[in-house]
């Protein structure tokens, strides 16, 4: 084969690979149907979670940037109205909220990743219910609490990241030593089989066993992940800041897009009663509703 023929064959092969890589993923996203709620009293709104027991949404707000104790958690109704702007407020009623990022609802508690602590509040009253210092933590971000009271927090601060584990007796350990291979994890969740799934600055969604051993990875169309939300059918909702969208990935690994043109999707939530995706944006201080098909 001549050199020219080799070049042409290589170019053709590269074109096929590029074309395959460029194939669009299935999408049900419709920007016209994405309802945005802005200018509603939020300030640096990072995370939203559905409180199924009380049919309401809880939203963490960093408040003014800095180390002041001025973060807060707002309550939104399912029709998009803020019914209690500062249900829990740093500096009031004994609450400390300096830089509240991820929140999670379980066991009648609101768990909050805040600065170098895991904080707990009563779900009904908002009263403080304890806190756990996280020695060596850089920036605890997202979190997931299991029914037995174990909490997993992503830490993407510092030069490398990890997953912090807090036992039901408040013992703190690392699921995996700090290492670049963790890709500075942000979104973290625990699946029905007990495995831990996380995603961070890269394009891989990683699965680990309870001892931190890597089980497998799934490469996504885009990365820079925020929250990961497991659904009842074992699929996952995954926020991608790199793609400015939200993916749904089935248990078999099939990926589709369910929301798009979200400038910086934060720690998403899911309303199981309405089959609704909830998307916060921190800087925009907004919430987007996406009713899923």
List the model feature ranges, each with a label.
Residues 23-32, 71:
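Blade/loop signatures of beta-propeller domains
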Residues 32, 117-148:
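Asp-box/WD-like beta-propeller blade repeats and closely related beta-sheet repeat scaffolds
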Residues 41-54, 70, 90-109, 135-154, ...:
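Beta-rich, blade/repeat-based domains predominating
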Residues 69-74, 117-119, 161-164, 204-206, ...:
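A short loop-to-beta-strand structural motif that recurs across blades of beta-propeller domains
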Residues 76-81, 122-127, 166-171, 209-213, ...:
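Short loop/turn segments that connect beta-strands within beta-propeller blades
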Residues 9-15:
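Bacterial N-terminal signal peptides
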Residues 32-39, 82-94, 127-133, 171-179, ...:
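A short beta-strand motif characteristic of beta-propeller blades
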Residues 62-64, 115, 156-158, 200-202, ...:
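Short loop/turn segments immediately following the C-termini of beta-strands
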């Amino acid at each position: 084969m001549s050199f020219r023929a080799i070049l042409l064959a290589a170019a053709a092969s590269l074109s096929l690979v590029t074309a395959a890589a460029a194939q669009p993923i299935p999408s049900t996203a419709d920007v016209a149907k994405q309802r945005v709620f802005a200018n509603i009293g939020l300030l640096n709104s990072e995370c939203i979670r559905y409180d199924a027991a009380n049919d309401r949404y809880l939203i963490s707000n960093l408040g003014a940037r800095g180390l002041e104790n001025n973060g807060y958690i707002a309550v939104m109704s399912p029709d998009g109205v803020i019914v209690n702007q500062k249900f829990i407020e740093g500096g009031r009623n004994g609450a400390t909220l300096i830089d509240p990022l991820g929140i999670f609802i379980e066991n009648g508690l609101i768990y909050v990743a805040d600065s170098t602590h895991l904080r707990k509040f009563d779900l009904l009253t908002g009263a403080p219910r304890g806190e756990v210092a996280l020695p060596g933590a850089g920036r605890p971000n997202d979190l997931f609490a299991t029914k037995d009271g174990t909490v997993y927090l992503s830490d993407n601060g510092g030069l490398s990241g990890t997953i912090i584990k807090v036992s039901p007796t408040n013992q703190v350990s690392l699921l995996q030593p700090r290492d670049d291979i963790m890709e500075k994890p942000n979104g973290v969740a625990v699946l029905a089989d007990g495995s831990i799934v996380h995603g961070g600055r890269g394009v891989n969604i990683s699965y680990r066993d309870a001892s931190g051993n890597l089980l497998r990875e799934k490469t996504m169309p885009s990365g820079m992940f925020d929250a990961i939300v497991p659904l009842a059918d074992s699929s996952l909702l995954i926020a991608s800041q790199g793609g400015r969208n939200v993916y749904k990935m089935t248990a078999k690994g099939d990926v589709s897009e369910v929301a798009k043109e979200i400038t910086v999707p934060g720690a998403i939530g899911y309303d199981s009663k309405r089959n609704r995706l909830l998307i916060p944006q921190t800087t925009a201080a907004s919430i987007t509703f996406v009713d899923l098909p």
